[in-house]
């Protein structure tokens, strides 16, 4: 824990004890100003903001913090549908093999540089590992190389038109271009300097950075922002937002309850404190997201010495974990257990082949697993290590899972704890995941676009003609997003056939067949689907949350996404 965070934690504790209201809020009796513009607020989050460049993998509310600065071509509306944002429209051709995006004209990055087709091409080309792209640095190699493996070329047709050609047809390509809110556009000036790229985020978004370290971000209103409200007032409305990392949910909850923080985000894993805040309706307002972060634990099959090389070991773990009980004990029933690696509304949903909790079966498979290991010369038996974030809630949640595995006869090492940013970097690294499991994946959303990449044998199929596949980066990152690190090419055959299918009924059937195979072989264990929750102190008088109209005129409910609130249209009554 850094000294900066210790100081913040101490400050929160003192403020909670000394005050019932944050210094950034207005007195309850104050009259609202005629203008919506102005105001400064503070927001508490769980996850460390590890950085702003291509290689910085962020999750949940840390991702949401960076989205104050960054924007993407594609967004989602209140119903989860993909809608235009920096792009004003798109069209697919050649059966989903070519995608053409028309960009909005006249947009600038916060430093004054033009947002245009050349900039979009630069961002996508660097993200996919094209070393000849302007500004490319070896430091920019990232999971994007695997995620973008199906992209063969990116062409700037004119200033506002970008054409993306794929190796294989993909009728869910918009899901990949959204990428759970991660597919953001960075300014050329940020990309130009690899020494500062991770600390100097420059985007087209409503705010720009004033100061930044991994545990505290201060942003101010971007005067060059391109959006106006229906009255012609330039957005955003707020002048400044301070985002602080408060690891302990107890402190974060107390801070937003007392008004030390104007708003704070929470995960389903922090259910004890979410439930408590839900019961304080006179003090805070809740903005809850959909349970669209798909619960998937993925056994790492090719980690050196991993018992998960053997299907019996994978199925032993799958049958051992009592997810419904875990949901009741640790998540207070707030998780959603669909019995599948995706939710019931998803095109890939099926319970076929999925193991469900059965201790007797788990013990049978543990015996078979140990026999497999003994035959392979392993004398230590079935042994695993789980990991947890440094927060108390994360550790206690992991202990509950470990208890179920031990009950089935699996030997468990001490839980490994590290910052979430460290864990993410160790899972999504060149050469593959360092841990026995990927205890969850970034997979989310209504389509297969940001689900499929995590289950194929590698980012690039064996017969790929993509020139990046044979480069050191293509080889090094081929297994990064394929979290199971497996070699079952039947998964590829099933998923790619479904991806290319244009008949809606057949497409769903093909995706379900792929899911059934993944579940039956223990390649991914169905767990609990979770959401993000944001609570706002009522004395902060924040208005307009969830009411902002998108550029296409649709109401956007950003609380539905894992990244939390959309702050562009939020204003403070004064």
Question: Can you say where each PLM-predicted feature lies in the sequence?
Answer:
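Gly/Pro-rich hinge or "lid" segments in bacterial periplasmic/extracellular proteins
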Residues: 178-236, 240, 565-574
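Structural transition elements
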Residues: 207, 336-370, 388-396, 502
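Long beta-strand-rich cores associated with HINT superfamily self-processing modules
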Residues: 534-574
